[in-house]
Regions:
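Catalytic/RNA-binding core of pseudouridine synthases
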Residues: 1-246
Length: 246
């Protein structure tokens, strides 16, 4: 390609498919760009998750913090009535055993997910709206003494990450077909949808984990206008770059 690496700059909206990491998506894009072009992303999507991955190219990488700080919208499916070690579908289901946590201080006694009504699930979901303290999943990229928490857990360590302040602007229960709850969540930086699934299940006394996750919006960028990763070419990549504003 003829364009010098120094001239390419902007934001690129990608619709990440399930089954690949955000880092792998970045590598695919880098192969289409001039050698030496900087490429980063503004917010990791787990391998099982799909949707909007905002890539920052060239000088736009300087705006990473600003883009990561923008509001994000997710569509998610939560399965109530069971848990997994990773709070998502990437580990085996286990029966839920109630335990004393901040999320269970006012929880109902253990029960079956099938017994829950739409209104009960919705009321539980609404308790996570606002500025809340959220305990990140142990299987996360957050570092503990320089090592990713997930790597420490896989090595056999017991990790209990401290709750952190996050903001959930809105949460909507779209459908409840026991044991699956379909939700839409609008949130700020650092919010773990997996943790909301986990804590909602604990609050309702049945356990819960995330089965599907799709990011649909970051700031003003929407997944409906994003390029599919398998349809990327050098030409459509360049014409699809959006300017990065400070």
């Amino acid at each position: 390609m003829n364009e010098p690496a120094t001239q390419l700059s902007g934001l690129l909206a990608i619709d990440k498919p399930a089954g690949i990491t955000s880092a792998r998506a970045v590598e695919r894009v880098k192969r289409l760009l001039p050698r030496g072009t900087k490429v980063g992303h503004a917010g990791t999507l787990d391998s099982f998750a799909t949707g909007l991955l905002v890539l920052l190219i060239g000088k736009a990488t300087r705006q990473c913090e600003a883009v990561m700080g923008q509001r994000k919208t997710y569509e998610a499916t939560i399965k109530l009535g069971a848990i997994t070690e990773t709070d998502d579908p990437e580990s085996a289901e286990q029966p839920f055993v109630p335990r004393e946590t901040p999320a269970t201080q006012h929880a109902v006694p253990a029960r079956r997910a099938d017994d829950l009504s739409f209104d009960e699930v919705d009321r539980g979901l609404q308790t996570f709206v606002g500025e809340i303290m959220q305990r990140p999943p142990a299987y996360s990229a957050l570092k503990v003494q320089g090592v990713r928490a997930a790597d420490r857990v896989r090595a056999g360590e017991s990790i209990a990450l401290a709750p952190r302040p996050v903001t959930v602007y809105a949460a909507r229960l779209v459908a409840w077909d026991a044991p699956l709850a379909r939700v839409v969540i609008d949130c700020g930086r650092g919010t773990y949808i997996r943790a909301i699934a986990r804590d909602l299940g604990e609050l309702l006394g049945v356990g819960g984990f995330l089965t599907e996750l799709r990011r649909t919006r970051t700031g003003s960028m929407e997944v409906s206008a994003a390029l599919r990763l398998d349809a990327l070419s050098r030409d459509n990549l360049i014409v699809s770059l959006q300017p990065a504003t400070a």
